[in-house]
Amino acid sequence: MCDLIGVDTLAIMIIWLNGTFGAGKTTTAKELVRLIPKARIFDPEEVGFMLRHVPGLPEVSDFQDWRPWRGLVVETASQLLDYVGGVLVVPQTVLVEQYWAEIHSGLEKAGIPVHHFLLHTDQDTLVHRIETDTVETGARQWRLDHVPDYHTALSWLSREAEIIDTTGTPPAQVARAVAAGVEARSAGGQ
């Protein structure tokens, strides 16, 4: 681990890594926790997996469609930061603008600064990454099916997040670009 110059390592914050499936969020998150002291990964997918076991919830194709998922993501992040402090790195795709607004405003109300980054890659690289992923091979078709949703969401995502192009960029370099963005935003009071 190394300290980021200019980042208050005592402050709490969230670094939210958005982007379509295959953009490099999880890999970048792992690199970021090596760069930033007191950083840990919080994966909101786990909240969704928990909710799948609750009887009576309506059937949905994506657990983000459950309002409790969005509220629990905010509450869990808030509780974690209250308990352990530091920085939460959140590698989570959110493609519905209303859902992002709910999560972001909830975190804002809790007094948690959010640094939102969109990891973007070109179409060929994206499809190659999805098709050659050996970790979650069962999710391959689901990820490919959601690429059009990502392209639809790009207009609002590009307004809401700082875009980092991951095409042909090694994960460690992407993580350094995100860390530099956090450092610049923190220094600028954003």
Regions found by a protein language model. Name each.
Residues 1-12:
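N-terminal amphipathic/basic-hydrophobic helices that include classical n-h-c signal peptides
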Residues 17:
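Hydrophobic anchor at the beta1->P-loop junction of P-loop NTPases
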Residues 21:
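The conserved Walker
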Residues 24:
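Conserved glycine(s) of the Walker
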Residues 27-75:
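Conserved substrate/cofactor phosphate-moiety recognition/catalytic segment
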Residues 65-116:
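Glycine-rich phosphate-binding loop used to anchor ATP phosphates in small-molecule kinases
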Residues 108-130:
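Conserved phosphate-donor/acceptor-positioning beta-strand/loop module used by diverse small-molecule
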Residues 132-177, 185, 189:
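Small-molecule kinase domains that catalyze NTP-dependent phosphoryl transfer to phosphate-bearing small molecules
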